[in-house]
Amino acid sequence: MKKKANEEKAPKRAKQEAKTEATQENKAKESNKENKNNKAKEGKIKEAKTKESKVKETAKEPIPVKKLSFNEALEELFANSLSDCVSYESIIQISAKVPTLAQIKKIKELCQKYQKKLVSSSEYAKKLNAIDKIKNTEEKQKVLDEELEDGYDFLKEKDFLEWSRSDSPVRMYLREMGDIKLLSKDEEIELSKQIRLGEDIILDAICSVPYLIDFIYAYKDALINRERRVKELFRSFDDDDENSVSDPKKDDDSEEDEENEERKKVVSEKDKKRVEKVQESFKALDKAKKEWLKALEAPIDEKEDELVRSLTLAYKRQTLKDRLYDLEPTSKLINELVKTMETTLKSGDGFEKELKRLEYKLPLFNDTLIANHKKILANITNMTKEDIIAQVPEATMVSVYMDLKKLFLTKEASEEGFDLAPNKLKEILEQIKRGKLISDRAKNKMAKSNLRLVVSIAKRFTSRGLPFLDLIQEGNIGLMKAVDKFEHEKGFKFSTYATWWIKQAISRAIADQARTIRIPIHMIDTINRINKVMRKHIQETGKEPDLEVVAEEVGLSLDKVKNVIKVTKEPISLETPVGNDDDGKFGDFVEDKNIVSSIDHIMREDLKAQIESVLDQLNEREKAVIRMRFGLLDDESDRTLEEIGKELNVTRERVRQIESSAIKKLRSPQYGRILRNYLRI
């Protein structure tokens, strides 16, 4: 019996053991799967973290560049020189000081090794100019050859016809923009170097003429006194504070007055800092100029090595150029310098042409005007604007004479100041123009290659009050600022740097131009804060919050919040159509409170009729006195007793007596009852 019982229990135990083994195996498999999943997740997280860290490293840390020693950098300079010469200034840029005797020995060895000649920066620029002219002629010839080959290409003509079918300027702009290739990072660096090269050539030319340094230094007082805007002439000074802070308006609200006073204090502090910065920069420029002139005018020591002297002068000149580079003169200032130099070169026929061009604007059609014109020209440099106004017959001629005065003054000052031969001056002018051409070409190429970036950013700002083309143009302005301020040495891509400038330019344009009535920038910041709080409450509660809650969260008074919300309301045009008919306009339904209503008009006419009927009870003289005394004539003006007496040829006392007798008659109850009803209305 026991054996049978054990035999019966055996398969049951086996089944239970098999079940337990199966469950253990399943658990083991599940745990293995979980471990694998966890490991995979950890691996992904680690990969993501490593990617993020790599991105952060690439975004934050600049690309490490191996710094070359003086000898290595010098070797590279001589080896990579485009022409058969090397400038003194390029050597100074490597050493950042006057080279030692050992370094000068190395320079001489490299000159012999590479068969290079040491020259000044102006001579080096002249060499590069000659090379550039050859390249330009070759490029022009290539373009002409391509045009001749494509002259009979009918397929391209067909493509042009299809392209020209689109009338939308946005489509045309986007289509043309799509043909421009994007730049690689190496190409961006190369273009940045080209921009710097062009600016170096310009500054080299300016530094070679002391008068041009004085010409730039003369802007110091104009900048401090705000006669000229700083950012028009120099990029290094941030002059955007003038635009960002608007003139505070007068308001009865004491809180707004306090804010305006605080804003004025902030503006005055910024003005002080700006003036200090301008003074420091120009002081450093003046100091560098004096040191350079001192080295230039120092007596020549026959025992001193000529190369040492040349490198010393180059070092002083490079210091002056660095101080000038700190100011970052704009294209507008460089154009003014070019115009000054061109005016100096316009001696003889050139100057006469400019003079005749301005004289053509004057109406000199008789001998008297011609004689007066010659008299003014004889002493125009000593005349003020008031003197010119006193001598010319028409106000329109004053501006022309002021231009003539500027022409004569510029010619006199430049002839005295430049103290250079015309050929030398012409070389410097060509050097400035060439540097500007190199810089402008590189800037244009960099800007054109990033137009797609502007469009992609401008798309995010649509439906904000400005047309899409306007957004693109404002973004392009920001792009050009980014091109001016980009520094490739920091290791960032240009698109990363330019994005902020483009967004800033577009958002500022929307704030300034999107609304019919302009709102100051500081008010827009407050509006955005209030809108953010209101959106947050709507998302959380599903309804608009009370203004008290908004005021508390924003940190403003309730009245201030109400005023800000009033400001945000867009004005409605009087030409807005109303109703289904096209003829109905909103302006037709607006009440004109200056016009008398029809009921008031009827009441007034009825009152006039009743007054006339009452006055008919008086004699002619009494009627005339009452009408003139109480303004019942057509002009509705009250006259004094003296004025009435003069018109009626009676004394003042007699007029008073007539008036009192007439009023006595009108006080009768039968007349007063009629007019009393009008007083109640």
Swiss-Prot record:
DNA-binding region positions on the chain: 641-660
Gene Ontology CC entries for this record: cytoplasm
Keyword Cell cycle: no
Gene3D superfamilies (alphabetical): RNA Polymerase Primary Sigma Factor (1.10.601.10), Winged helix-like DNA-binding domain superfamily/Winged helix DNA-binding domain (1.10.10.10)
Location(s), subcellular: Cytoplasm
Presence of keyword Transcription: yes
Location of the motif Interaction with polymerase core subunit RpoC: 470-473
Region entry Sigma-70 factor domain-3, spans: 525-601
Keywords for this protein: Cytoplasm, DNA-binding, Sigma factor, Transcription, Transcription regulation
Region spans: Sigma-70 factor domain-4: 614-668
InterPro entries: RNA_pol_sigma-70_dom, RNA_pol_sigma70, RNA_pol_sigma70_r1_2, RNA_pol_sigma70_r2, RNA_pol_sigma70_r3, RNA_pol_sigma70_r4, RNA_pol_sigma_r2, RNA_pol_sigma_r3/r4-like
Biased composition annotated in UniProt, kind: Basic and acidic residues: 261-270
SUPFAM superfamilies per record: Sigma2 domain of RNA polymerase sigma factors, Sigma3 and sigma4 domains of RNA polymerase sigma factors
Superkingdom to which the source organism belongs: Bacteria
Region (Sigma-70 factor domain-2): 446-516
Molecular-function GO term, any one: sigma factor activity
Chain residue ranges for the region called Disordered: 1-60, 239-270
NCBIfam families xref list: PRK05658.1 (NF004208), RpoD_Cterm (TIGR02393), sigma70-ECF (TIGR02937)
Subunit structure: Interacts transiently with the RNA polymerase catalytic core.
Family statement: Belongs to the sigma-70 factor family. RpoD/SigA subfamily.
Role of this protein: Sigma factors are initiation factors that promote the attachment of RNA polymerase to specific initiation sites and are then released. This sigma factor is the primary sigma factor during exponential growth.
Name of this protein: RNA polymerase sigma factor RpoD
